[in-house]
Amino acid sequence: MWWFRRRDRAPLRATSSLSLRWRVMLLAMSMVAMVVVLMSFAVYAVISAALYSDIDNQLQSRAQLLIASGSLAADPGKAIEGTAYSDVNAMLVNPGQSIYTAQQPGQTLPVGAAEKAVIRGELFMSRRTTADQRVLAIRLTNGSSLLISKSLKPTEAVMNKLRWVLLIVGGIGVAVAAVAGGMVTRAGLRPVGRLTEAAERVARTDDLRPIPVFGSDELARLTEAFNLMLRALAESRERQARLVTDAGHELRTPLTSLRTNVELLMASMAPGAPRLPKQEMVDLRADVLAQIEELSTLVGDLVDLSRGDAGEVVHEPVDMADVVDRSLERVRRRRNDIHFDVEVIGWQVYGDTAGLSRMALNLMDNAAKWSPPGGHVGVRLSQLDASHAELVVSDRGPGIPVQERRLVFERFYRSASARALPGSGLGLAIVKQVVLNHGGLLRIEDTDPGGQPPGTSIYVLLPGRRMPIPQLPGATAGARSTDIENSRGSANVISVESQSTRAT
């Protein structure tokens, strides 16, 4: 449930840049337009070269026909006059004698510098294009010169029509490309539109329903990734809501009891009020302190849980042997009547120092809580393979029934027998959270299967690597064990590191 009123979210603002759909359409149009322009230039150049080459071939053929027929020598006037019935202009020049011409209506065969050079005998042949004609001049063997020209207007008319055809076809191609690009883009971006609508729906309404996935392309994978994000967000919100609800429920009981005791103390100290007996006053104050301690523990556990849920951890190399030592020292301050049998190796885990320390502390606290006075708790950290080690914390308590072993790691779960003991029901939940966040595994077994009591052993599998063993002067190989006594109790510490004995 929400404790605070949720403020309305501002609608998402549209960006001023072009949409992806329009950009894809413009890209398709640009590419097609570029191809059309290049193809049009190529087609125009090829056809133009072919038409003008054909005109040159026609002029050359007509000249060769006149020369080969011998008519220019036998009857030049009649030969030149015969060309008037075709589509060419002709001129035969006999220097110092005569000039014969035959021209099409409205046309004049142009005589320029190139043609004059042929007539003077300076050139054997020339070709050139004037304003609207193609002119061929050839020097004959008898000293005369033959000039033939053809109008370019029909060719230019064809090229002009070709330009219009290419322009129209290119425009149609660009338009078709734009329409096709728009249709393809619309179909291709439909999943993106669904993702956008889903994101806006989440922002407006907190609706975390998954989006249907169609196909198996990149957009389908993007949709699946978005659905995974929605599921993770839904699970996170569910955890937050459950944590807030459970915390409110768990805090209500100690707060109510604390309030009652404080009110009773204040009432007994009011002027004229009857005084409580001294022993009852002492017990009442002790209850208040115990309830404050219980609240502090509960709040600390809640902070650790929320910190783990939010992923606010710093990963660094952690020596689990040091973690076990520090945690053991704290537990023994609270339970100096318990004997701890410790066997550890140097094992490095890349993870959160605070979280791993809290995990080890909670396991030892739980084992000590269920152990009778003077009992033994075993703590063993051993290597299983090159990349995994196992931390085992064992007690000789009443054990955990098989049907409850999965439940004890749930938040605020407390069995019927555990409700009479101090605790928040969050200790093993924190252990589970830390272990899973570090890629580990958990399991529970009986310490003494079939025994009475069977006891409980919690196994934690942790990935990592073996710590390098420093070579100390006078060190000998092999494990050493020592029983160390101090003012608060004893612990049997077995160090597999062979160089030192860990005193706790």
UniProtKB/Swiss-Prot annotation:
Bilayer topology: Multi-pass membrane protein
Compartment(s) where it occurs, according to its Swiss-Prot or TrEMBL record: Cell membrane
One Pfam family this sequence matches: HisKA
Topological domains annotated Cytoplasmic: 1-26, 185-504
Induction: Induced by MprA. Induced by low concentrations of sodium dodecyl sulfate (SDS). In strain BCG / Pasteur, induced during growth in macrophages.
Chief place of localization: membrane
EC number: 2.7.13.3, 3.1.3.-
In-chain residues carrying the UniProt-annotated modification Phosphohistidine: 249
Keyword entries, A-Z: ATP-binding, Cell membrane, Hydrolase, Kinase, Magnesium, Manganese, Membrane, Nucleotide-binding, Phosphoprotein, Protein phosphatase, Stress response, Transferase, Transmembrane, Transmembrane helix, Two-component regulatory system, Virulence
Residues on Extracellular side: 48-163
Reactions the enzyme catalyzes: ATP + protein L-histidine = ADP + protein N-phospho-L-histidine
Ranges annotated as biased composition (Polar residues): 487-504
PTM text: Autophosphorylated.
Residues annotated as domain HAMP: 186-238
Transmembrane segments: 27-47, 164-184
Record GO terms (molecular function): ATP binding; phosphoprotein phosphatase activity; phosphorelay sensor kinase activity
Role played: Member of the two-component regulatory system MprB/MprA which contributes to maintaining a balance among several systems involved in stress resistance and is required for establishment and maintenance of persistent infection in the host. In response to environmental signals MprB acts both as a membrane-associated protein kinase that undergoes autophosphorylation and subsequently transfers the phosphate to MprA, and a protein phosphatase that dephosphorylates phospho-MprA. MprB/MprA up-regulates expression of mprA and pepD.
Stated name of the protein: Signal transduction histidine-protein kinase/phosphatase MprB
